[in-house]
């Protein structure tokens, strides 16, 4: 909340969602820390998941970096701000887009390609590990007959700074909390 409040003067509209408003505080913190650069890409859609054909992000996720670039110039000062539009849905297209976006930085195409391969593999491993952990947790909860709630919402609801402590409130009532991205694959 403090982070949000200290950049409230840079938020152009009350109609922006809370996570978008929170970005302003993060950017101010980064600029004040005098980081080498700020990397905040515009992502139109993510990788295809299962059989879903709707992998588009909301307009705020897609374009908010552009708003930050134009509304926070005074805050960022001379800190380089990178906000390329990236095709995160397709790793093959991602490499050339990153090479173009990072042309001013000392990264070779092979380094970028290796980084994308490593990151993609790690993300898939993380998802697989999470699915397996959820599967084991569900089995234990069923065996122990623990009341359980699947807390569904936007991905940012997992952020403790945004979710208002809802998961903790639920667990304080003796119930378990599972996330929709953890249980969704179990129904397949």
Region spans (language model):
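An N-terminal assembly and electron-transfer interface module characteristic of large anaerobic redox
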Residues: 1-188
């Amino acid at each position: 909340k403090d982070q949000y409040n200290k950049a409230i003067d840079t938020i152009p509209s009350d109609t922006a969602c809370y996570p978008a408003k929170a970005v302003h505080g993060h950017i101010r913190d980064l600029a004040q820390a005098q980081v080498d650069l700020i990397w905040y890409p515009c992502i139109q859609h993510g990788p295809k998941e299962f059989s879903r054909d709707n992998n588009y992000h909301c307009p705020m996720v897609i374009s908010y970096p552009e708003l930050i670039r134009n509304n926070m110039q005074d805050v960022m000062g001379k800190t380089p701000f990178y906000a390329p539009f990236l095709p995160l849905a397709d790793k093959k297209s991602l490499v050339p887009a990153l090479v173009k976006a990072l042309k001013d930085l000392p990264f070779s195409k092979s380094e970028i390609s290796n980084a994308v391969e490593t990151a993609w593999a790690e993300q898939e491993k993380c998802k697989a590990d999470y699915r397996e952990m959820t599967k084991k947790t569900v089995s234990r909860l069923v065996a122990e007959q623990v009341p359980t709630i699947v807390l569904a919402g936007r991905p940012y609801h997992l952020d403790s700074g945004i979710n208002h402590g809802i998961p903790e409130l639920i667990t304080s009532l003796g119930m378990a909390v599972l996330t929709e991205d953890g249980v969704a694959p179990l129904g397949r």
